[in-house]
Amino acid sequence: MAREKFERSKPHVNIGTIGHVDHGKTTLTAAISTVLAANSSGPGKKFDEIDSAPEERARGITINTAHVEYETAARHYAHVDCPGHADYVKNMITGAAQMDGAILVCSAADGPMPQTREHILLAKQVGVPHIVVFLNKADMVDDEELLELVELEVQELLSKYDFPGDEIPFVAGSALLALETAVGKPDIGRGEDKWVDTIFELMDKIDEYIPTPERETDKSFLMAVEDVFSITGRGTVATGRIERGQVKVGDTIEIIGLRETRTTTITGLEMFQKSLEEALAGDNVGILVRGIQKTDIERGMVLAAPGSITPHTKFEGEVYVLTKEEGGRHTPFFTGYRPQFYVRTTDVTGTIAQFTADDGSAAEMVMPGDRIKMTAQLIHPIAIEKGMRFAIREGGRTVGAGVVSKILE
């Protein structure tokens, strides 16, 4: 019997709220969820349900994240909101909640603040592709010119970090007043309240401006090798979970990482001891390859569509260093530190050549709990790409989490 598919008629998009503490991220999340509850299958989430987010573990790090779902006429959204600033940093770097786009919440009464800047920088570094801005607390600003001034400041900040500041949609409103009105009148529609309308306007902008992401199955094929064995008379099988794309018997693929890249043909696909013609993203499969010895493939290599990914040894990454309480180091580390970089399925030793602070200055050392940009040099080439997540390990325990922000060589 065929596996039951999760049916959904609307395209799905993952978004999240980012911005400075107390500018209204969680209130906005609650307001959107409550205003759209009438159109959505699920009930709206209250502020305190979102604010007391449960702890999750991603790559060995504890993160508090709230997940909210809602629908517009056009799409289904999964929305992530984090209670604390440290949770944002950890969430964005580990990719625990992937974002196809973000809502930058900035208080119109205060203007951009340090974390506004930091979250924009982080969004750039970890590859959040699109941002829409909500200028919150607009009810506290009587002067239209002041509102325009804040909008200009935020635009400049976005442009500074290579987001298209002048194209990004801005909506000014009051999340709190919209939330209070919507709670009092759950089936409120458009045109009934000016603050609730700003929430509808924001969602219209998100529907229009944040593109529907390419589905995992439509991307180029990639599978990280977890195990290898040989079947007498048939050849070598590499097993793993297909990360993206799809693959068929007869396809040409490349074996990448740790050694010279090799090209081969798929002669068979197996899942749960049954052979298949094709396999898709998310499937755990065994891939039988032609003319390859068992000794030619090892854990840590990837099988991928030809030309889609290349091996590298040097990259820049945005890294969060775990605190002692999180099981990380008790002491700082310095340039020249040689940990293991755990990428996809394997550890590769590398040296940290330099640390760079947010302002571009070189840092000598990094303390547990810091976030820093670093340049790493691996001893073996492996398949790496921008946006890929990795862990930094030392003697088998995770001491840092990172994301590749730039390939150097």
Curated annotation (Swiss-Prot):
What terms describe the molecular function in GO for this protein? GTP binding; GTPase activity; translation elongation factor activity
Instruction: Return the annotated region ranges for G4.
Output: 136-139
Q: What segment(s) does the record annotate as region G3?
A: 81-84
Annotated positions binding Mg(2+): 26
Question: Pfam families, alphabetically?
Answer: GTP_EFTU, GTP_EFTU_D2, GTP_EFTU_D3
Instruction: Name the domain of life this protein comes from.
Output: Eukaryota
Q: Where is this region: G2?
A: 60-64
SS bond list: none
What is the E.C. number? 3.6.5.3
Q: Which UniProt keywords apply?
A: Chloroplast, Elongation factor, GTP-binding, Hydrolase, Magnesium, Metal-binding, Nucleotide-binding, Plastid, Protein biosynthesis
State the compartments where it is located: Plastid, Chloroplast
Which residue ranges does the record annotate as region G1? 19-26
The role this protein plays is: GTP hydrolase that promotes the GTP-dependent binding of aminoacyl-tRNA to the A-site of ribosomes during protein biosynthesis.
Protein family according to the UniProt entry: Belongs to the TRAFAC class translation factor GTPase superfamily. Classic translation factor GTPase family. EF-Tu/EF-1A subfamily.
This one is known as Elongation factor Tu, chloroplastic
- Organism equals Rhodomonas salina
